[in-house]
């Protein structure tokens, strides 16, 4: 089954609500949607970065250029089912650009799984779990509004784990914000925080113990992505788990973080690692090192979320579960059906490949003009 065509479409999907982070406020999310055609089938994937190039060195625009200029010409005509060879060719041809590679890699996995009439999770070994508890991000910036959202999510049995974005306000104001939320919902929900690199080590060393005392169970990326030494000291000095997100940007970074036990958990993201196989390698590094795997998101659409869910469902343990909330923070979905959240878990979709199909009308509607 030879690759006949690789199409890349830029889409911009509005957020259903502003998402306030330490470095930007996300009003919309842009994606490079990939469709690979072979043997009468189409495999789909996507590449993106939260808020554009402010979070990483890639964005939807660079992903499209890298694929169309370098990766697509290299892969067209090759055997679509030889996933290892295709990954090797991409690695040799392009340095970094992991989200571009992941978009291709996921589409190829989807294509092969569809050709075998298998779910993606079966293609890579089989799902251990059919649903994963899913956290919701509270990022309105308003304490009372965040409390109301948390109460609603618990009542509807959608989420009882909440990640709260910090770093825009002062640490003291952030702590008061956290304490008020935990006071209201802490007996019914777990609370973790994401600082998105906003603090230096001294600030983190003062305020992380106070967050732990307030009832926070997990602290994500408190310091700059490159400051592995600070992460190691903070992890050693605090009982609350420290989660690497921005710091986990390659297989090499995973090895270094694990070798020095800099953190307690890895935030897995297919787009950070270059696709399915490398994400599973990072999870294996984590497991061998006593580090927890956490199901991260790049605010993926239902396409990227389905792919990640299939991968995460094959992992034996995920103590802090996942945050695959992307499809529900967007104003609309790009697929014909929405993924399901039931009893606080996101459910693994059935059907071949990713288990979701692009809605052509919605794809056209959100395609960027020009």
From Swiss-Prot:
Residues noted as binding Mn(2+) in the record, renumbered to the chain: 194, 220, 245
Pathway: Aromatic compound metabolism; 3-chlorocatechol degradation
Coiled-coil regions, chain positions: none
Family: Belongs to the mandelate racemase/muconate lactonizing enzyme family.
Enzyme superclass (EC): isomerase
Keyword Isomerase: yes
SUPFAM superfamilies: Enolase C-terminal domain-like, Enolase N-terminal domain-like
Catalytic reactions of this protein: 2-[(2R)-2-chloro-2,5-dihydro-5-oxofuryl]acetate = 3-chloro-cis,cis-muconate + H(+)
Protein name listed in UniProt: Chloromuconate cycloisomerase
Gene: clcB
A biological-process GO annotation: amino acid catabolic process
């Amino acid at each position: 089954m030879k690759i006949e065509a690789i199409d890349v479409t830029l889409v911009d999907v509005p957020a259903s609500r502003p998402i306030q982070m330490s470095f930007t406020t996300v009003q919309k999310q842009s994606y490079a949607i990939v469709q690979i055609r072979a043997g009468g089938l189409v495999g789909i994937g996507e590449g993106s970065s939260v808020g554009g190039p402010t979070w990483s060195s890639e964005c939807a625009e660079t992903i499209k250029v890298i694929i169309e200029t370098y990766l697509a010409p290299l892969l067209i005509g090759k055997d679509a089912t030889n996933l290892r060879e295709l990954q090797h060719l991409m690695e040799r041809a392009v340095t970094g650009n992991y989200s571009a590679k992941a978009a291709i890699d996921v589409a190829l996995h989807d294509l092969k799984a569809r050709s075998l009439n298998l779910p993606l999770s079966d293609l890579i070994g089989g799902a251990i779990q059919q649903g994963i508890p899913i956290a919701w991000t509270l990022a309105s910036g308003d304490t009372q509004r965040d409390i109301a959202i948390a109460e609603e999510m618990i009542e509807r049995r959608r989420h009882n784990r909440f990640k709260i974005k910090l770093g825009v306000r002062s640490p003291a104001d952030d702590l008061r914000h956290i304490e008020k939320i935990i006071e209201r919902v802490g007996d019914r929900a777990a609370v973790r925080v994401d600082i998105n690199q906003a603090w230096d080590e001294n600030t983190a060393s003062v305020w992380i113990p106070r967050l732990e005392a307030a009832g926070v169970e997990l602290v994500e990326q408190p310091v700059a992505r490159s400051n592995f030494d600070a992460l190691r000291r903070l992890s050693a000095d605090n009982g609350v788990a420290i989660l690497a997100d921005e710091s986990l940007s390659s297989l090499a970074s995973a090895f270094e973080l694990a070798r020095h036990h800099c953190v307690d958990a890895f935030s897995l993201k297919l787009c950070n690692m270059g696709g399915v196989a490398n994400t599973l390698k990072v999870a294996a590094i984590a497991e061998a090192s006593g580090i927890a795997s956490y199901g991260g998101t790049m605010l993926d659409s239902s396409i990227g979320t389905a792919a990640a869910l299939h991968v995460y469902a094959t992992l034996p343990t995920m103590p802090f579960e996942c945050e695959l909330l992307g499809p529900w923070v967007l104003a609309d979905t790009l697929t014909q059906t929405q993924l399901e959240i039931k009893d606080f878990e996101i459910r693994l979709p059935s059907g071949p490949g990713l288990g979701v199909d692009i809605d052509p009308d919605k794809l056209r509607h959100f395609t960027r003009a020009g």
